[in-house]
Amino acid sequence: MTGSITLRGFGWRPLGRRAPVVAGLDLRVEPGERVLLAGPSGAGKSTVLRAVAGVLATAGDGDLLGEVETEGRIGLLLQNPGDAVVAERIGRDVAFGLENARVAPDAMWPRVRAALEAVRLPYGVQHPTAALSGGELQRAALAGVLASRADVLLLDEPTSMLDDANAEGVRRCITDVVAESGATLVVVEHRLAPWLDHVDRVVVLGRDGEVVADTDPATFAATMRDDLASAGVWMPGVSAPEPVEPPAALVVPHRRPAPTLEAVALSVDLRRTDMRGTVVAAALREVDATLAPDAVTVLGGPSGAGKSTLLATLGGLQRPTAGEVRGLGMPPHRMRSRALAAVVGWVPQNPEHGFLTTRVRDEVAATSRPVGVDVDVDAVLAHLGLDRLADANPYRLSGGEQRRLALGAALAHRPSVLLLDEPTVGQDRGTWAAVAGWMRAAAHGGAVVAAASHDSALVSCADHVVRLADGRNAVPAPRVEEAR
């Protein structure tokens, strides 16, 4: 029946892994059902979505067991929306699926524009995809899925990189589309509360990929709160856990004292060139920011405000158009890679783009060797909950596991400056506490710690907040108000 999903004894073991990510999973989703799929980091939620979409075993990189049946046209939003970008311009990217479905141009482009408007993306169809922020890429990818008018919508953390206002708008857009079309919806999220009023059913996977809860939202919220919160699930009404700090020896900067890093009247233009010509986008305009040692600073603001660009410029990965970065003795973009890496640890928004090896253990040590710092790899992996994956391939981890690995790899050599782009995306309660604890312990040890984030729980742990809007400094709000 169109829109139905059936898994019988489904299992998946990635190539090179001894244990399966998911084993013996039985699940039936009826046509038109709206299902919230939850569970701790690494439980196999994304694996299930990819299996249902039929894209899990296409590269022959694992063993698939059991049966998976999906009836109807499928729209899949990947956990990392950048993985789905196929065109240089937003319009062509959103239209890609429609072109493959042979939708006539006179019908296709109105659907493309309507989808972009629905996801609140404020750009025309000619805007370059390379100039989009992570949150904007997420909305562009969702627009492509919604424009397809699929019978089954599979959405992997569709709001994880969005500010609260845009996240609410996207949820409303999704539920409106589902209500109008009658499509089946399976959405994966870690932060469950905003979705409970929009779904019929909540399915929770355990750490071994087994179903530990399958019920309606009201029963889920009323009877399972404490048990599932202790298992790592972000339950409604349960406050964020206390950060768990690693031993000081893992995080205290190997070079002290750490510098105060300053952005002074910083402006950045992003230039993108394709066959149509060069497009210049103003990413930052005269931004001032001070990142002090012994403190955690969060860069806040809506999607597309310039947070990632500011981090990249502070870390020497982006050359400023005007203004300067002070504190490292010379402009960071002019420093040699080894000298910069010894001082600055940077975790990008898409962590898998920076992996250098094919084994988790080796990845943690990869940066430390060139800069001459000994690292207790086992202790780093244990704190980040990756010890059982020490011999796994980094590219076959879950999104949350990849993000923690990137953090361990970038920070294990104890740099003086930590620049983290959305470090808590894809984390359950336990792994969130480990990431937040690493940040806080590094700051207590004298490091400069800065993170771009929409996570209000992380903001509540910050000592300072720098807010951006439209590439400029916004009026800063008190930290307590930010946390709300």
Region annotations inferred by a language model:
Residues 53, 315:
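Helix-to-loop junction immediately C-terminal to a conserved catalytic motif
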Residues 61-74, 323-331, 340:
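Conserved ABC transporter NBD signature motif
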Residues 107-124, 372-389:
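Conserved ABC ATPase "signature" region
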Residues 128-132, 136, 393-397, 401:
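Conserved ABC ATPase signature
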Residues 142, 170, 407-408:
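Hydrophobic anchor residue at the start of the ABC signature
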Residues 145-146, 410-411:
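ABC ATPase C-loop
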Residues 153-157, 418-422:
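Catalytic Walker B motif of ABC-type/P-loop ATPase nucleotide-binding domains
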Residues 208-233, 472-484:
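Conserved beta-strand-loop-alpha-helix hinge in the C-terminal portion
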